[in-house]
């Protein structure tokens, strides 16, 4: 089993690489790539951690050596948010980075499961899909926008508000991965109820949690450690599914049947070829139904922006 991290020298990439080095199954290979010359050194640093995960690091313009034989590719390359920026401001820089890396994935390991972390995810996943399609290798069951950070944040915030053990809380989050497109389904959390005011303020906090971190870091970065954990959780779920474990379920932003938008985050059953089944979002409260219909225009615009970038 080989996992490749593209963008491995950044804040998210290094946190993700550390978690994978300590949590991937014994005998796995972990390959790190970044344009930054420090990347082989990150691999050397991690190689001193005594786990049975073989590690290698590559830098420069060409990601091919890192991608050869990859089963899972996790992409965190790009610039991070700074105060005053929203995820869409990142588009101008990150769109080109994702296009370039996906072209290399298409040429080197077209059958790999691909997880996109690079923001704006609503748009970068559409870019990746169009690039893969142009290369004739697109399989919508193998491409994922990683929205797990919204889920772990929702779990943490609900546990804090309701005095629950965070490990026991599981909040489904649907829609997209920025601002109003993030929709936590608080009505579906078992054993917990929320009044209208709690629902509204908690939903808003989950939607704006990225900004909370950017502002708290006072210009010193964005959410790197929690995102590294979220990406590791999702990447490890893909690995478990590839190894044949049954009942691996995670939410992610994927191309579906287009019921709400071409790409949409929903619960997925994962298997050896990626997505086995897109699970329905279930029954929504009136608040959630309204939030869903209100966000769709924004989500569709984000998707169109990505599609048009590749044309």
UniProtKB/Swiss-Prot annotation:
Enzyme class: oxidoreductase
Residues annotated as the enzyme's active site: 177 (proton acceptor)
Enzyme Commission numbers on file: 1.1.1.37
GO terms of molecular function: L-malate dehydrogenase (NAD+) activity
InterPro entries per record: L-lactate/malate_DH, Lactate/malate_DH_C, Lactate/malate_DH_N, Lactate_DH/Glyco_Ohase_4_C, Malate_DH_AS, Malate_DH_type1, Malate_DH_type1_bac, NAD(P)-bd_dom_sf
Cellular component annotations (GO), alphabetically ordered: cytoplasm
GO biological process: malate metabolic process; tricarboxylic acid cycle
Binding site for substrate: 81, 87, 119, 153
Pfam families, per the entry: Ldh_1_C (PF02866), Ldh_1_N (PF00056)
Annotated residues for binding of NAD(+): 7-13, 34, 94, 117-119, 227
Assembly and interaction partners: Homodimer.
Biological role: Catalyzes the reversible oxidation of malate to oxaloacetate.
Family: Belongs to the LDH/MDH superfamily. MDH type 1 family.
Name of the protein in question: Malate dehydrogenase
């Amino acid at each position: 089993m080989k996992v490749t991290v593209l963008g491995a020298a950044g804040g998210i990439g290094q946190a993700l690489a550390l978690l994978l080095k300590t949590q991937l199954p014994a005998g796995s290979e972990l390959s790190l790539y970044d344009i930054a010359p420090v990347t082989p050194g990150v691999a050397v640093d991690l190689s001193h951690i005594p786990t049975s995960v073989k590690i290698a690091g590559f830098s420069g313009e060409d990601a091919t050596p890192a991608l050869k034989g990859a089963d899972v590719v996790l992409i965190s390359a790009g610039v991070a948010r700074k105060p005053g920026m929203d995820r869409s401001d990142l588009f101008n820089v990150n769109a080109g980075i994702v296009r370039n890396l996906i072209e290399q994935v298409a040429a080197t390991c077209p059958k790999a499961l691909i997880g996109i972390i690079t923001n704006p995810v609503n748009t970068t996943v559409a870019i990746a899909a169009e690039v893969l399609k142009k290369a004739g290798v697109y399989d919508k069951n193998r491409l994922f926008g990683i929205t797990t950070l919204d889920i772990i944040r929702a779990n943490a915030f609900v546990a804090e508000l309701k005095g629950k053990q965070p490990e026991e809380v599981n909040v489904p989050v649907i829609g997209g991965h920025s601002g109003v497109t993030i929709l936590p389904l608080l009505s579906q959390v078992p054993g917990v109820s929320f009044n209208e005011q709690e629902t509204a303020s908690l939903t808003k906090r989950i939607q704006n949690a990225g900004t909370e971190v950017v502002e708290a870091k006072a210009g010193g970065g964005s959410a790197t450690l929690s995102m590294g954990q979220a990406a590791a959780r999702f990447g490890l779920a893909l690995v478990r599914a590839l190894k044949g474990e049954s009942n691996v379920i995670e939410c992610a932003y994927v191309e579906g049947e287009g019921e709400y938008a071409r790409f949409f985050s929903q619960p997925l059953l994962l298997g050896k070829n990626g997505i086995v089944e897109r699970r329905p979002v279930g029954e929504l409260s009136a608040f959630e139904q309204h939030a869903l219909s209100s966000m769709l225009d924004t989500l569709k615009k984000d998707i169109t922006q990505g599609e048009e970038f590749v044309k």
